[in-house]
Swiss-Prot record:
The lineage of its organism: Bacteria, Bacillati, Actinomycetota, Actinomycetes, Mycobacteriales. This is Aromatic amino acid aminotransferase. Its EC number is 2.6.1.57. Its cofactor is pyridoxal 5'-phosphate. GO terms for molecular function: aromatic-amino-acid transaminase activity; histidinol-phosphate transaminase activity; pyridoxal phosphate binding. It comes from Corynebacterium diphtheriae (strain ATCC 700971 / NCTC 13129 / Biotype gravis).
Amino acid sequence: MIRKDLSQIPTYVPGKRNDHALKLSSNEVTHRPLPSAAQAMAEAAAGANRYPDMGVTELRGALSEHLGVPAEQIAVGCGSSALCQQLVQITCTPGDEVVFPWRSFEAYPIFVQVVGATPVAVPLTSDGFNDLDAMAAAITPKTKLVFVCNPNNPSGTVVRREAFLEFMAKVPADVVVALDEAYTEYVRDEDTIFATEILSEFPNLVGLRTFSKAFGLAGVRVGYAFGPHELIDALNKVALPFGVNAVGQAGALASLNNLDELMEHTEEVVAVRDRVADHIGAAHSQANFVWIPAESRSETPFEIAEKLAAHDVLVRAFPEGVRITVTNEEESDRLLAAWDASFA
C-alpha cells in the first residue's frame, strides 16, 4: 500500500529534550514570546472555533512593510520548513535534481526525496562555508532548485554579496534559487547578502525566513517566502488550506509590531556567542549557535553530546560535528561550566 521508496527516506530527528536539562539542541530562544504576542495569541485561541484567515492578509501586509516587498509577493506557511517543501513541490517531479550544501539543514534531502526527486548534496568548504563554485558546477539540465543556507545551519557561516552575485550569474534562469535566511536577524557581518537587497534583479530568486528563531514563536509554526509573483502564486497553490493557524498569525503580527524589543534579545546572543565559541574551540558564528567540527576534537561529536548531557546540557551531535545553541549570558555560563567539568 505504501510507496516502496519511503523506506529509503530518513525521518527528521529533532533536538533532544529533557525538562530538567538546559536545552541547547534546537536553536530556540530562551525568552518566552513578548507579552503583547502572548496576549494576542490567547485572544486568537479564544476564537479557535473559526477557521483562520487563509490568505494571512494582515500579516502579509505587515511583512510587506517590514521587508519592502509587495504583499502579493509574499507567501506565509506553516514554518519556513513547509515552504521549503512547497518549493520542491512546485519545481520538481520524479527524476529532477535539487542542489544544496552539506552539512546544512537536515530536512533538505527529506523534502527532495518525498516528491521522488534526487538530492545533490555539495560538501561545504573546509572552513564551513557554502561552496558556491562547487554548487554551480553541480547544476545539470535536471536541476530545478538550489537551496543556499545563509547563515548556514549548522556551521554559522554566511554568504558574501560578491560571491553570491557571481554564483547567480552561473545559475540558469530556469533554475530556482532559494536563499534560506532562517537566522538572518542574528547576522552582523556587513558583507552578507540578503534576499531583499537583490530580489528585483533575479526572477528565479526566492527568500525564506521564519518566526521560529529570533521571534521566539517556534511552537506556533509561522514562516514566510518572498519572491517573484510566479513563484509565490505557485507556492500558494500547493499550500495546505488553512495551514497557518490563527494563533500563529496573531503572535507573528504582534511580534512584528514590537520589533525593537525582540531585537534586544538578539543582541544578547550576539554579545556572548564569540565568548562561547572561543571557550570551547568552536568557530565564530553569525547565527544563534556555534559549531565544533568533528575533526577539531579527539572525542566524537556523539561523545561530546553524551558528556554534556551528563551535566544536564543538551546539544545537537551530527557525524560532522556538534552544534550548540547560544542564548544569553546566564545559560552560556551554565554551558561553559558543564564544558569545563566534562573536558577540562
